[in-house]
Amino acid sequence: RTDVSLPEGGFTKMKGTLVWPVSGRVVSHYGTQRDPVFDIPVFRSGIHINAAPAAKVKASAEGKVVYANYFKGYQNLVIISHGEGYYTVYGNLGSITVKEGVYVKGGQVIGTVADNSNIGTPAVYFEVRYRGKPLNPEQWLKR
């Protein structure tokens, strides 16, 4: 395969329909929030979704894996390109089950949840980006 087959209108048309990477609730939201430790405002580029350690993490939509490796601050990290400058980012993975350069379908397993995360509980970190700019992932996930 050499291309991603998204609906007409591309990834933009998928807003509000993306597969949740894991079953769980959002425990850290996108945007500016007060840091509980340092009591200062911090901007979060993504969300944390709580999940059981070793739970399967799924691709939110079809695309090409462009990064699948350790990344400081995110543990094991997978980045999927969906074309037109759109990417999804999956961090705090305990294991990665895909390789860079492969194409994945929405709902396909790409890894597992790590035993811990930088928020003190097992959770997957998830971002949606457009041309490098973070977007609110909660607006993109299936409601």
Residue ranges of each PLM-predicted region?
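Extracytoplasmic/periplasmic cell wall- or extracellular glycan-interacting regions that localize
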Residues: 1-75, 79-81, 134-143
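Short beta-alpha junctions and helix-cap segments that line functional grooves
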Residues: 11-13, 36, 92-93, 113-114, ...
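Conserved positions in beta-strands of structured domains
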Residues: 27, 64-66, 94, 111-114
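Well-ordered beta-strand positions in beta-sheet-rich domains
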Residues: 46, 77, 87-89, 123
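Short histidine-centered loop motifs in beta-beta connectors
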Residues: 68, 86-103, 107
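Short, loop-centered acidic/histidine patches that primarily coordinate divalent metals
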Residues: 82-83, 93, 129-131
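Conserved, short, structured surface segments that act as functional micro-motifs
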Residues: 100-143
